[in-house]
Amino acid sequence: MIDSKSGTSGGGREPNQKLLLSECGEGLSAYGLINHRHTSEIEQIASSISGNNIELLFTPHLIPISRGMLSTIYGRLRDPGLTSDDCRILLDNFYRNFNNIKVLPVDTY
């Protein structure tokens, strides 16, 4: 399950009334709940990386910021013996060359 929040810049460059600050300011809304255009892409990449067929639920939300994204991803681990610190090390190693992704320390929110 992926719960993502993004700013209005994710809506593209075309003028859109629902992306105006007067329309989306002080609120948030879910969109693209069924068959979001990025769901199949995320499933394909996750399946390729894991070596398993991954099916997921993706719920994007529009929040009143100009840019940025926060995603919380939930799932079951193949190895139930992994600790939070183990997972953090794995994520740090995987994303070490991605300057736009920041893996936060365990228990940081």
Where are the model-predicted features located?
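C-terminal substrate-binding/catalytic lobe of Rossmann-fold NAD(P)-dependent oxidoreductases
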Residues: 3-109
